[in-house]
Amino acid sequence: MARCGVASRRASEEIITSGRVTVNGASVTELGTKVSEKDCVCVDGKQIFIEEKKRYVLLNKPSGYVCSLSDEKGRAVASDLLKEAYTERLYNVGRLDMFSSGLIIFTNDGEFAARLSHPSAELEKEYIVDSSSPLP
């Protein structure tokens, strides 16, 4: 389900165990259930399909947006800036503070995101900071 852009792996597990998934019309609540390309998989009654095309988007995030897929406080979310141009679910790779601006990658390629963001990759990241106030 994560490869279909429905939700993250952890959220997909919750969706499955809560009984919101059907395979060929039968409810499925067991994690690890195998399906084939011929099976009809639905979440909340809507059929889902595997995302075949990998998408990589570089966004110049403006200040005032949260780097998250949703925000319980109702704040503006950076991924919303992409919704008009892209229909698939895109995830941010890393994050920037709400009040900072800068480049951030969004993708539907979970393996790519993990290679960039997991500490074991030991990738060096460089940040350039401009402050509107003098630093102490």
Language-model features: locations:
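Basic, flexible Lys/Arg- and Gly-enriched helix-loop patches that mediate nucleic-acid binding at interfaces
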Residues: 2-136
